[in-house]
A protein has these predicted regions:
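Noncatalytic, beta-rich nucleic-acid-contacting surfaces in large DNA/RNA-processing enzymes
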Residues: 1-502
Length: 502
C-alpha cells in the first residue's frame, strides 16, 4: 500500500496512533481492491486547479481518512468519530461519490478551468426528462462531470462538453462521476473572510449565543424557522451541536427524533442494523441501501431468510427513505453555519453586507434589510434628502431601511388568565403543510412583532397567507415558546398592495 500513488499525494500525514493507522490501512485496502485510486487522484487534481477557490466536501466523503489526508476534505473523521462505512466498504456495489461545493458565483470559473485543462476528455452529465412516462428530452445535470484518460468518443456526446448519458448510465459504463455544486453559504462566508472553514474554535460563547437564542436570520443554511427551533431546543454550545441542528430538521430525522433511540444520521441506521442483526457494518449498510432504495430486494442470510426480520426495526429503516444526512454531511454544513454565526456575532456589518449581496432567503424581502439596518451606516436609502415613512417605504420598495418595526406590530398577553396572547405584525415567512396522516392542513407563520423580534405561530388549518402582508389574532403560547393560534386574520399595516386576481 505504501507503493500506491495515492499515498505520495497526501497533503497531511495522520498521527501514527493505532486508531489512525488502522483506519488508513482499512481504507487503502478497499481503494486498492476496488480500483478506486484513479477517482481520488482525479479529484485531487481538480482541486489543484482551484487553490484560490474555497471548497467544502458535502456527503459521505467527509468520513474518509484518505480524503482528509489528500486535503480533499478538512473533516478529520477519526477526531469527529465518523465511521467510513457510509462512504465505502467491501460490499458496496458502486463507486462512492465525492461531491464538491464551491461558491455559486465562482463555479463557472471552476468549470472553465477544468474544461481548459482536459478539453475533449471532460464532459457534463445529463438528465433524462420524461413526460407522461415517456422520454421527452435531455437536460443538464446539476453538477456532474466525468474526466477520461482519452478523448470522449463523439457517439457519447449530445454536443461538445455534454454527454448523452445520465448518472446511472455513467455508473454502468464504469466512469467516475464527480459533482461540482454551487453554495451560496460559501460565497457569503468568502466575502467576509478567507479564514479556513475548520479553523474556527469548536466552542465559542458568542457564536453559541447567536444560534441557541434563535438569532440566526441571515445565516444561509441556518435561518429557517425549523433550524432556529432545533437550535434553541437543543441549546447549541459548539460546532458539533450546529451540525446536529442542521441534521435534525431533515424529514427522516424529524420522524425518528421522538423514538426511544433517536436516529438522526444514516450512520445511526447502519449502527442500529449492525447491532440488532449482529452483522458487520458493511453488511448493515447493504441492508440499509436495499430497504431505503425500495427495490423490493432482501439481503438473505445463511438460513435462507432475510437478515432483517424485525418489523419494527424495518419500519424505522424504511422511514429513512425520506431525506436524511449522513454524519459527515451534517458536520460539513454545520461548520459553515457555525462560521457564519461566528462572524454575525463579531463582525455584524461585514456579515450583513455579504448577506444582502448573496442570500436568496425564504423570508419576505423586508426581513434581511430590517435585520441589517442597525449594523449598516450606509444603508441604500439612509441619508436621503426626503426620507420616507416606514409604511410608505415598505409599500414603494418592498422593504424599509429603519431598524424599527412597522408601526402597529405588537405582542402582549391578554389579562384574562388564559395564557392567550394578542399578536399583530408583518409576515416574515409562511408555509402551508399538509399532513397525510391526519388528512389536514397546517399553516406555519413567522411574524415580526418588534424590532428584530419574531414569533412562530402554528395555525391549525390552511390559510391563503402567501398573499397576505400582515396578520393579527389570538394565540396560546406553549412551553417551548411557540404559539398556536385560535384566531387569525389578515390585517393591513402597510407594504405592497395585494395583486387583484383577474
Amino acid at each position: 500500500m505504501e507503493e500506491m500513488q495515492l499515498v505520495h499525494q497526501f497533503r497531511r500525514m495522520p498521527p501514527l496512533t493505532p486508531a489512525y493507522v488502522g483506519r488508513l490501512k482499512h481504507e487503502l485496502r478497499i481503494i486498492e481492491k476496488h480500483n478506486l485510486e484513479p477517482m481520488f487522484l482525479r479529484v485531487r487534481e481538480i482541486l489543484d486547479l482551484m487553490p484560490d477557490v474555497p471548497h467544502n466536501i458535502r456527503g459521505s466523503a467527509g468520513s474518509s481518512l484518505v480524503c482528509y489526508c489528500l486535503g480533499i476534505t478538512d473533516i478529520d473523521p477519526v477526531e469527529w468519530d465518523i465511521p467510513s462505512t457510509r462512504f465505502m466498504h467491501d460490499l458496496r456495489p458502486d463507486a462512492p461519490d465525492i461531491d464538491i461545493d464551491v461558491p455559486y458565483n465562482r463555479r463557472a470559473e471552476v468549470f472553465d478551468r477544468i474544461f481548459r485543462k482536459y478539453g475533449s476528455r471532460v464532459a457534463r452529465v445529463s438528465n433524462r426528462v420524461h413526460r407522461d412516462g415517456e422520454f421527452h428530452h435531455w437536460s443538464l445535470h446539476c453538477g456532474g462531470i466525468i474526466v477520461t484518460d482519452d478523448a470522449i468518443p463523439s457517439h457519447m456526446l449530445l454536443k461538445p462538453g455534454q454527454l448523452n448519458m445520465n448518472k446511472d448510465d455513467v455508473e454502468k459504463a464504469g466512469f467516475y462521476k464527480i459533482d461540482l455544486l454551487s453554495s451560496r453559504a460559501l460565497a457569503q462566508l468568502n466575502d467576509i473572510t478567507d479564514r479556513p472553514l475548520f479553523d474556527y474554535p469548536r466552542q465559542d460563547a458568542l457564536t453559541a449565543q447567536v444560534l441557541s437564542s434563535g438569532n440566526s436570520i441571515g445565516i444561509i443554511g441556518g435561518e429557517s424557522p425549523a433550524f432556529r427551533k432545533a437550535a434553541t431546543s437543543i441549546g447549541v454550545t459548539c460546532m458539533q451541536d450546529a451540525a446536529l441542528a442542521t441534521s435534525l430538521i431533515r424529514p427522516a430525522a424529524a420522524e425518528n427524533k421522538k423514538s426511544e433511540e433517536p436516529l438522526v444520521y444514516e450512520d445511526d441506521v447502519i449502527a442500529l442494523i449492525a447491532r440488532t442483526c449482529r452483522v458487520e457494518s458493511d453488511m448493515a449498510d447493504l441492508i440499509r441501501r436495499q430497504i431505503v432504495k425500495g427495490k423490493g430486494m432482501e439481503v438473505i442470510g445463511p438460513d435462507g431468510e432475510p437478515i432483517l426480520k424485525d418489523p419494527a426495526l424495518r419500519q424505522r429503516v424504511e422511514s429513512f427513505r425520506a431525506y436524511a444526512f449522513c454524519r459527515s454531511h451534517g458536520v460539513a454544513y454545520g461548520a459553515v453555519v457555525w462560521a457564519l454565526a461566528y462572524h454575525k456575532a463579531r463582525n455584524p456589518a461585514d456579515f450583513w453586507k455579504s448577506t444582502l449581496a448573496h442570500a436568496h432567503s425564504m423570508y419576505r424581502p423586508w426581513v434581511h434589510p430590517h435585520e441589517a439596518a442597525p449594523h449598516l451606516s450606509t444603508h441604500p436609502r439612509q441619508g436621503e434628502l426626503f426620507p420616507l415613512d416606514i409604511r410608505e417605504e415598505w409599500k414603494k420598495f418592498g422593504y424599509w431601511s429603519s431598524p424599527q418595526m412597522v408601526p402597529g406590530a405588537e405582542l402582549f398577553e391578554l389579562e384574562d388568565g388564559s395564557d392567550r396572547w394578542r399578536f399583530c405584525g408583518p409576515i416574515a415567512a409562511s408555509r402551508v403543510w399538509y399532513s397525510k396522516k391526519d388528512n389536514r392542513k397546517l399553516t406555519f407563520l413567522t411574524l415580526g412583532v418588534g424590532p428584530q423580534t419574531y414569533i412562530n405561530i402554528t395555525v391549525p388549518f390552511g390559510l391563503p397567507a402567501g398573499g397576505w402582508t400582515a396578520a393579527e389574532g389570538v394565540a396560546k403560547r406553549g412551553k417551548n415558546g411557540e404559539y398556536t393560534a385560535s384566531l387569525v386574520r389578515e390585517c393591513y399595516l402597510g407594504g405592497p398592495s395585494r395583486k387583484k386576481k383577474r
